[in-house]
């Protein structure tokens, strides 16, 4: 059968759920999220891993990069059923957020990719990768009670994945939403030139 973890991501402030983000098979989990945003704001992510312990003794930590730069994830709670992390980022404009347990492209190329337009409240799956992922435009009451209650994190974990990530920062990051806007601007300029010629 192979290893089948469950991995879900909740954008708390946007009330959005990214469900079944984990690979169909394999000891790896992560995704790419393109954030389309026109104002400065903090964004809170709750990351829920439900490990398949059948073939592993320890779950890999979840790491995060914002526009290629390493950020901190806080371990809130760890039980037999689930491992819950929290990540808070500050964005001033469009951004790329990457969650990952591995850096090997054998795995990361199979991660799903999402576009979250916070201005228009539109949410899209750009690439399913090797997953059955889907988006809920809300966080269910069941998930709120299981993962977002105030007593989550009372164990006092201070663990962070920031120091464990020894990979170099990447400067060349491709932003889907930025490229899309640039293409639209170029099309508008061409239309204006044609109107002037007429």
UniProtKB/Swiss-Prot annotation:
GO biological process, one term: viral process
Region (Disordered) residue spans: 153-198
Biased composition (Acidic residues): 156-171, 178-198
Pfam families for the chain: Pox_C7_F8A
InterPro entries (alphabetical): Poxvirus_C7/F8A
Family of this protein: Belongs to the poxviridae C7 protein family.
Function: Plays a role for multiplication of the virus in different cell types.
Protein's name according to its UniProt entry: Probable host range protein 2-3
Organism field: Rabbit fibroma virus (strain Kasza)
């Amino acid at each position: 059968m192979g290893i089948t973890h469950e991995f879900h991501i909740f954008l708390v402030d946007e009330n959005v759920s990214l469900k079944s983000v984990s690979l169909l098979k394999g000891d790896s989990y992560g995704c790419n999220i393109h954030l389309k945003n026109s104002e400065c704001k903090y964004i809170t992510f709750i990351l829920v891993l439900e490990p398949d312990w059948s073939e592993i003794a320890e779950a890999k930590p979840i790491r995060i990069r914002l526009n290629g730069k390493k950020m901190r994830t806080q371990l809130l709670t760890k039980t037999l059923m689930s491992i819950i992390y929290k990540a808070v980022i500050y964005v001033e404009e469009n951004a790329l957020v990457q969650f990952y347990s591995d850096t090997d492209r054998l795995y990361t190329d199979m991660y799903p990719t999402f576009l979250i337009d916070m201005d228009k409240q539109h949410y899209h799956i750009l690439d399913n990768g090797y997953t059955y992922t889907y988006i809920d435009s809300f966080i269910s009451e069941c998930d709120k009670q299981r993962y977002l209650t105030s007593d989550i994190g009372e164990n006092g974990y201070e663990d962070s994945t920031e120091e464990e990530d020894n990979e170099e920062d990447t400067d060349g990051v491709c932003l889907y939403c930025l490229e899309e806007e640039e293409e639209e601007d170029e099309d508008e300029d061409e239309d204006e030139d044609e109107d002037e010629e007429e």
